[in-house]
Amino acid sequence: MRGSNPEIDNQAECLGQKFAQLFDAAPRIFQAPGRVNLIGEHTDYNDGFVMPAAIDFCTRVAIAPRHDRKLVVRSENFAEQREFNLDAFPDKGSGHWSDYVIGVAKTLSFSGSTPIGANLLIEGDVPQGAGLSSSASLEVAVGYALLDVAGEAIDLTKLALLCQKAENEFVGARCGIMDQFISSHGQNGHALLLDCRSLEYRPLPLGDEARLVIC
């Protein structure tokens, strides 16, 4: 989500400090938001129109390159660390939170990108299982971080499609494109009118007095 939020900026700074203590390196930090959907529930996977909006809850990823072909991934939310070899991807996910990370890395690799070894520290405040797209937020933040640290060009629509593919084919969740698309394209103070068939989209200003209430 584009725009500035002092609280989110402070959380990102704290994550960077934790990363430096854990990995003894200065990271780059990326974040991607969760979402609410205002119009068009259950129409994204039927190629219909939807109108989601990004929210302030987000997933943050601190990342720095390694000198080998490993991804070392630590989750602050789960207080757990996992390691993966970029040259030996598993066939499918195992039902673990890290499936979303390795699934994105694998999908990027099989789409012509070349992820490099990296250390990642992940935390987020998108409520899990609440319909706010915590998984898409994680996928997009990780995908953007992996592409950036590898020095690769980033096309936001392609990133959204690859993250959707990772969730469909590696994680095994049959989602449409809406969640990953708004997480990668969301703008502060705007909803997004999206045609899920053509992927044409238009940001719609919400207005200064508009409030989105999540309950």
PLM-predicted stretches and their roles:
Residues 2-29, 57-162:
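Anion-binding (especially nucleotide phosphate/pyrophosphate-binding) glycine-rich loop
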Residues 28-32, 83, 211-215:
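Short amphipathic
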Residues 34, 59, 69, 116-118, ...:
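Structural beta-strand/beta-sheet cores of well-ordered domains, especially the beta-sheet scaffolds
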Residues 42, 54-55:
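N-terminal cofactor/phosphate-binding cores enriched in small/glycine residues
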Residues 46, 152-215:
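ATP-dependent small-molecule kinase catalytic core of the GHMP/sugar-kinase superfamily
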Residues 46-47, 129:
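Short, solvent-exposed loop/turn segments at secondary-structure junctions
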Residues 47-54:
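Short Gly/aromatic-enriched secondary-structure transition segments
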